[in-house]
Amino acid sequence: MHPFFQELQQGSQKLGLSLSDEALTLLLKYQDALVLWNKAYNLTAIRDPKEMLVKHLLDSLSILKDLPAGRLLDVGTGGGMPGMIIALCQPERSCVLLDSNGKKIRFLKQFIADLKLKNVIAVQTRVENQDTIDELGQFDVITSRAFASLTDFVGAARPYLHEQSIIAAMKGLIPVEEMEELKQEFSCKVIELHVPRLDEQRHLLLLQRI
């Protein structure tokens, strides 16, 4: 058994999730690969596996039960947070992980190939690239935890939206001023997240066109 298996299992249960042993094992394989590649490719500033478990895996898992179903785009995915974690837990969901950083996408593509994952692809491009917009089309859910600015994220997501699409933004503090700027066009539901062993404010913002 993986040394972090029980810790991840207990953490996910505290988040209200009932993940299978297979899903937990896949998540830990992903973390092991991230730790290994991080030594050479600097994929994340977090190097301690125990800290990674909390700040990457559990943090990403904290939004899982609040995400609507459907095809998902993760913008600025970096090393795959939260997109890869969602894909591993929900094999029925089609996921596209998008980032402009070649090293990070190379890591994700290799991991996808090694595990023969069928529901997720990684694409190296900029979110505003018109060819990318034309090729990928529209999504039901668009996630990100990379954008400092909510308005920037909404602007980047806009070409990928259909009428019912949900923008799911992972934030620390609630960006009240930015929400005010967007309220004429988007409804916004704020969900307070409680990540086990993380003593920081975390929120999920679910935005939808009015």
From Swiss-Prot:
Keyword Cytoplasm: yes
Subcellular location: Cytoplasm
Main location: cytoplasm
Pfam families xrefs: GidB
Catalytic activity: guanosine(527) in 16S rRNA + S-adenosyl-L-methionine = N(7)-methylguanosine(527) in 16S rRNA + S-adenosyl-L-homocysteine
Keyword S-adenosyl-L-methionine: yes
GO MF entry, a single one: rRNA (guanine-N7-)-methyltransferase activity
GO cellular component terms listed in the entry, alphabetical order: cytosol
Broad class of enzyme this protein falls into: transferase
InterPro entries listed in its UniProt record: rRNA_ssu_MeTfrase_G, SAM-dependent_MTases_sf
Domain of life assignment: Bacteria
UniProt-listed NCBIfam families: rsmG_gidB
Function: Specifically methylates the N7 position of guanine in position 527 of 16S rRNA.
HAMAP family assigned: 16SrRNA_methyltr_G (MF_00074)
Protein name, as recorded: Ribosomal RNA small subunit methyltransferase G
Organism taxonomic ancestry: Bacteria, Pseudomonadati, Pseudomonadota, Gammaproteobacteria, Moraxellales
